Amino acid sequence: MTEGSPIKFELVDINAILQTLPHRFPMLLIDRVINIRADYSGIGIKNVTFNEPAFQGHFPERPVYPGVMMIEAMAQTAGVIGIKSVEGTEKPRAVYFLTIDKCKFRKPVLPGDTIEYHMRSLGRRKTMWWFHGDAKVNGQVVAEADVGAMLTD
């Protein structure tokens, strides 16, 4: 993220996310997105609670938030950033998650953690977007990946 890049949206709350993405419980995996900047970067926020449906099976004796959920949340954060960034100039209505590259899981995420999905654009070609994401808990990277998506109308 470029600190000098102007902020376009300081806060996209859950109500705005529900208007932007088609995802709903249990697959809506971000609570808000903050600091969407003109350079197509921003931060998704997820407050992880023990009530997450995934914890029923991952793992009952030692709950660990699934890495696949973090990757999906990165894609959702990138989708919000992409749609909000072109709002008013284009009319995308759907985001399709297409690729995952360079994915690494570094530390477990536990109930009570707050995950910050730091996403920044790697580039765009017409309706295709590529983002790099770092998932962080307390400032430490717990997962990272490059994700690709397509915005369509």
From Swiss-Prot:
Q: Which gene encodes it?
A: fabZ
The family database entries (Pfam families) matched by this protein are listed as: FabA
Localization recorded for this chain is: Cytoplasm
Q: What EC number is given for this enzyme?
A: 4.2.1.59
Tell me the InterPro entries matching this sequence. FabA_FabZ, FabZ, HotDog_dom_sf
The UniProt entry, under NCBIfam families, shows:
fabZ (TIGR01750), PRK00006.1 (NF000582)
Main localization category = cytoplasm
Where does it sit, as one GO cellular component term?
Answer: cytoplasm
BP term (GO), one? lipid A biosynthetic process
Q: What does this protein do?
A: Involved in unsaturated fatty acids biosynthesis. Catalyzes the dehydration of short chain beta-hydroxyacyl-ACPs and long chain saturated and unsaturated beta-hydroxyacyl-ACPs.
CDD domains the UniProt entry points to:
FabZ (cd01288)
**Active site at which residues?**
H58
An example molecular function term from Gene Ontology annotations: (3R)-hydroxyacyl-[acyl-carrier-protein] dehydratase activity
Question: What are the record keywords, sorted?
Answer: Cytoplasm, Lipid A biosynthesis, Lipid biosynthesis, Lipid metabolism, Lyase
Instruction: Give the family this protein belongs to, as stated in its UniProt record.
Output: Belongs to the thioester dehydratase family. FabZ subfamily.
Name of the protein described by the UniProt record: 3-hydroxyacyl-[acyl-carrier-protein] dehydratase FabZ
| Catalyzed reactions per annotation | a (3R)-hydroxyacyl-[ACP] = a (2E)-enoyl-[ACP] + H2O
